[in-house]
C-alpha cells in the first residue's frame, strides 16, 4: 500500500531540491525526519512538512502503521518559472529565471514492493524479447 503527498510551486530551484531529496530516498520515516531536522537547506523545511503530511495521509486514509513506513519515492520536478529582467550596460537586459519546484513523496509499508515491481518489469522484458526472437 502506498500513500502520497504533493506540494507544488515551492520557490526553490529543482536542482537544489534534488540534493535534499537524495538524502531521504529509501529511508525509514523516522530516519528521514531526523535527517531533515539536521539539514541546513531551505528545501529541508518544505520536505519535512510534506513528509508529515504523507504520514498523516498514510495513517488516516490508508490505515497504515507509522512506524513501518519508509520513503518509497521522492522527487523534485520543475515547476513554473518567473522571468524577470536585470538592466545591463548600453540599454540591454539580462533574463533572471526564478525557478519553482513541485515536490512529491510516496510512502510505503511493504519493504518488498520495489522488488516486486522490478521483477514484473524484468518479466515483461523477457516476454517481449521472446516474442521478437524471429525478427
Swiss-Prot record:
Q: Which Pfam families match?
A: Ribosomal_L22
> A single GO molecular function, which one?
rRNA binding
Q: Where are the transmembrane segments?
A: none
Any one Gene Ontology BP term: translation
Highest taxon above the source species:
Bacteria
Q: Gene3D superfamilies recorded for this chain?
A: Ribosomal protein L22/L17
Entry keyword Cell membrane: no
The record's keywords, sorted A to Z, are:
Ribonucleoprotein, Ribosomal protein, RNA-binding, rRNA-binding
InterPro entries from the entry? Ribosomal_uL22, Ribosomal_uL22_bac/chlpt-type, Ribosomal_uL22_bac/org-type, Ribosomal_uL22_CS, Ribosomal_uL22_sf
The cellular component terms of Gene Ontology attached to this UniProt record, alphabetical and capped at eight, are: cytosolic large ribosomal subunit
Q: Which HAMAP family match?
A: Ribosomal_uL22_B
Q: What does this protein do?
A: This protein binds specifically to 23S rRNA; its binding is stimulated by other ribosomal proteins, e.g. L4, L17, and L20. It is important during the early stages of 50S assembly. It makes multiple contacts with different domains of the 23S rRNA in the assembled 50S subunit and ribosome. The globular domain of the protein is located near the polypeptide exit tunnel on the outside of the subunit, while an extended beta-hairpin is found that lines the wall of the exit tunnel in the center of the 70S ribosome.
The family line of this record is: Belongs to the universal ribosomal protein uL22 family.
Q: Per its record, how is this protein called by name?
A: Large ribosomal subunit protein uL22
Organism, scientific name:
Malacoplasma penetrans (strain HF-2)
Lineage, top ranks: Bacteria, Bacillati, Mycoplasmatota, Mycoplasmoidales, Mycoplasmoidaceae
Amino acid at each position: 500500500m502506498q500513500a502520497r503527498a504533493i506540494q507544488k510551486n515551492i520557490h526553490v530551484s529543482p536542482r537544489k531540491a534534488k540534493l535534499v531529496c537524495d538524502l531521504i530516498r529509501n529511508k525509514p520515516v523516522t530516519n528521514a525526519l531526523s535527517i531533515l531536522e539536521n539539514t541546513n537547506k531551505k528545501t529541508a523545511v518544505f520536505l519535512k512538512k510534506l513528509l508529515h503530511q504523507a504520514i498523516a495521509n498514510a495513517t488516516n486514509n490508508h490505515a497504515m502503521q507509522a512506524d513501518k513506513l519508509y520513503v518509497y519515492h521522492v522527487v523534485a520536478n520543475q515547476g513554473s518559472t518567473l522571468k524577470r529582467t536585470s538592466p545591463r550596460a548600453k540599454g540591454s537586459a539580462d533574463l533572471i529565471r526564478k525557478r519553482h519546484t513541485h515536490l512529491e513523496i510516496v510512502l510505503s509499508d511493504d519493504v518488498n514492493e520495489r522488488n516486486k515491481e522490478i521483477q514484473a518489469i524484468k518479466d515483461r522484458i523477457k516476454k517481449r524479447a521472446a516474442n521478437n526472437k524471429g525478427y
